[in-house]
């Protein structure tokens, strides 16, 4: 189990509390959400944007998905919660977790453009619900 830096979480909550008009409990909740999101990914701040980009392998593990691939990149094995799944499902999971991020300014989950286009079924919604369940948003 990941141990969190409680001192840093409390400092972030107090800084947010002093800079905004939110209650301290709201600021503390936001600080915990941020700490849990940083376990899954990394913070990126540039060009007036603040985003948490999630690690694909960590997201697949969080969703209970195991995907192996050939050297060419094609899926060789996919299992969801220990049960064998189709190779196309593996592609959908890889597509749904690739380039997934949370925009801290807008408060929305998003992802980089899909390799397969918008028409292809993706597991992005399942990934977002797993993240929300983990960080308790």
What are these regions (language model features)?
Residues 1-137:
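Charged, low-complexity intrinsically disordered segments and flexible loops
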